Amino acid sequence: MTESPLLYDSTDWDFRTLQRSYDAIERIACEELGLEVYPNRIEIITSEQMLDVYTAHGMPLTYRHWSYGKRFLQHENSYRRGYSSLAYEVVINSNPCISYLMEENTATMQALVMAHAAFGHNHFFRNNHLFRQWTEASAILDYLEFARSYVSACEDQHGVAAVERVLDAAHALSRHGVHKHGGARPLNLKLDQKRERERRDYDESMFDDLWRTLPGTKAKNTTDSVVERRRRLGLPEENLLYFMEKVAPRLQSWQREIIRIVRLIAQYFYPQPQAKLMNEGCATWVHQRIMTRLHETGQINDAAFLEVLHSTSNVIMQPGFDHPAGGPGFNPYALGYAMMSDIERICVEPTEEDRRWFPDTAGNGDPLGTLRHAWANFRDESFVLQYLSPAVIRRFRMFRLLDDTSESTLLVDAIHDDAGYRAIRRTLAASYDPAAHDPDVQVVDVDLAGDRRLMLQHRTKPGQLLAQRDAEATLRHVSTLWGYEVRLQEVDADTEAVLATHTASPPAPA
């Protein structure tokens, strides 16, 4: 009796089944598709464990904080009441690349999510320039262990409430705690531990209670002194947490280290939203290609392949703009997969329109090389600007609305002609620009020898001011870390006119 070529023939699975499926998927991914991946670690988890993974933003471990418990309860209540379902998998940008698979998955779904996460996402994490520039996959797990141990030690030494105040403030500012230009310094756990010891030893050696009895000096209020102190402090500075860690006058060394932990973890996540469309599009295209090849070679049967098609169809469903289930923006799985498939088509079977729009790509006969090049060298904004085709614009029935606040109606000002295609492509690409979503808030001045008031500036446009309640709540967190008054001015980026001012003072000592 000859052995069946099928990897499995039922919905049930065991670990030998997973190993056979993984080996077959790996051969196609690496030998046929030319994917380059980190070593994989596959973990099977329960629904309760998946909720824990959700709580920590997909990371396998983290420090204690009340916000994680709150997030766990929100996800748990939504899941238990049937308002939401859990993901089939979660994958972590680390080396080795960790993929969490739900134990409730069928044998087919386990194969699909291994192809999707362990090879699609894994290849993207390893090769995309954003992740190569901003993250250190080999060091993140060790650093998270250090962070958890350090925060726990601070809680034992200084009290949970004191640590919580610093974490609350740092979390509130985490989106303003990343270096957006020039790349990130690679994580080095030994250097971080050495620096933390040196900070503690320095604070102990420099302490002298007599310093508090000396009278203060009056600062010079001249244009030269303002320019000089701003130059000395490296202002303006957009990384608020970095500035707090280095300059805040009242922070102790352990508080500075906690701020550093929060901002380095925020830096690790910085590339993710900038490449979500590409990342999900890459992983979906990869899993669909691999599962199709498994079916073509007789390694999965028709029933399994129908399950693959059903799952993928659900994932890439794009509701219409006026559909009750629709919302602003596009489903990243749907648009990402459509663009990857369209690039493949343009490389192999281009139309005359494709040749006009993509002369360097159309008919080159190398769809895999073209896709790998795109995955490595673009982010969502530039990817849409470079590769969104008229065919995909028509398929998704895209159009552009002009929302003029002085008019009572909306105007459709870009439709399906050459000028409209270009306008739609530019507008959609701009919507993926991270600068369009995060306010440009920078430290612009502080007189450390004077009143120590911290001056922040938000460069914006009339009609695009910060919500007052949110701005004031966030400023209170800034003042908690700074220790003195903080003032935020919202300034017209074109005219330099001050549009609004917000002020916050630090809380009274407990």
Residue ranges and their predicted role:
Residues 96-114, 269-278:
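Short pre-active-site segment immediately N-terminal to the catalytic Zn-binding motif
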Residues 124-186, 190, 283-299, 310-321:
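Post-HExxH zinc-binding segment in Zn-dependent metallohydrolases
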Residues 104, 108, 124, 299-510:
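Non-catalytic terminal regions of proteins
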